């Protein structure tokens, strides 16, 4: 899980150092201007890297737009590969809360679950079907991989 804070400026709030640091580090208005005409989804990053030996999927840092709000992840995130043969979906869920009436808090959370349903405040990162004894990959090596139905992100 990761969290973004953005200050709320309104009458009566005292401007403090933390608010200025968040404003400097997270220029939200720039995102809103640059990507206002983009649909919800991944804007940059969130690449998938598989580590076969450790059986881990790494999601790289990135920026996403969910419900016309922006959320960014500053560090890579790792998820264990499921061992049970099923259809899986990896999605990013965003929640928006107001903390102490001083900051907007946007929290992003990765969810790996069976099936293929997406609800409000979520975007799909990838879908895959696992098979026991096969390696999970994220690249196409030849034309036969285009027909491959399982273990490919």
Language model features: what each stretch is:
Residues 2-59:
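N-terminal "first-domain core" detector
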């Amino acid at each position: 899980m990761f969290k973004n804070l953005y200050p709320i400026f309104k009458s009566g709030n005292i401007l403090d150092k933390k608010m200025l640091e968040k404003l400097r580090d997270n220029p939200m208005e720039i995102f809103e201007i640059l990507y206002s005409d983009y649909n919800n989804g991944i804007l940059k990053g969130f690449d998938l890297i598989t580590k076969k030996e450790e059986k881990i999927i790494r999601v790289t840092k990135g920026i996403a737009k969910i419900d016309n709000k922006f959320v960014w992840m500053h560090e890579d995130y790792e998820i264990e590969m499921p061992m049970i043969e099923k259809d899986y979906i990896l999605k990013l869920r965003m929640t928006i809360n107001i903390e102490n009436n001083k900051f907007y808090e946007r929290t992003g959370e990765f969810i790996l679950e069976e099936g293929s349903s997406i609800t409000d405040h979520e975007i799909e990162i990838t879908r895959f079907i696992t098979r026991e004894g096969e390696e999970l990959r994220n690249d196409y090596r030849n034309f036969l991989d285009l027909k491959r139905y399982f273990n490919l992100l």
